């Protein structure tokens, strides 16, 4: 699997096919038992997650993993750039999610699912990542917030030149934003290519739940 710099790459497949495991291997939660992971020409397979974060990889997992007893502001501070010892919130990142600016003193656990997802993505963006990795960012999210998330992903790709890698099941969302798609079946890449491959009936059958 080769992920192109500056592109939005979507990984799709039925539940249980290894999509989340793949993302967690990229960011260092698992080590590959076969093959290796190259990033900018360097094998990073043995690096710990924090070492990969220093290289510019940021991850928004399924479930968001925000801190429920920390305020929104405190949650955001946990994502500040560990490379630059920055201790100020980036107003540009906050401007992408206006609702968060209104909730800085609220506890993370008091937010709705959609608000928590915005918080999780904003926290990752505060790391100023070169590669943003998201695991099903639209899961359980209302349409209005899905649009916000879509606009943010496109913005950071086009303006910040950030490489985006995401696992996603929502067809319309993928067709709107993806440059390339990898279809995973039983832990292997079944097919890959431009987003137009999703129109293939065989692909739709593979992805049918």
Predicted features, each with a name:
Residues 27:
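Helix-to-loop junction immediately C-terminal to a conserved catalytic motif
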Residues 12-14:
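The feature captures the beta-strand-to-loop junction immediately N-terminal to the Walker
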Residues 126-130:
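A short, proline-enriched helix->beta-strand linker immediately N-terminal to the Walker B motif
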Residues 107-111, 115:
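Conserved ABC ATPase signature
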Residues 35-42, 55, 88-95, 191:
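Conserved ABC transporter NBD signature motif
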Residues 43-63, 102-105, 198-204:
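ABC ATPase NBD coupling module
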Residues 70, 111, 124-125:
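ABC ATPase signature
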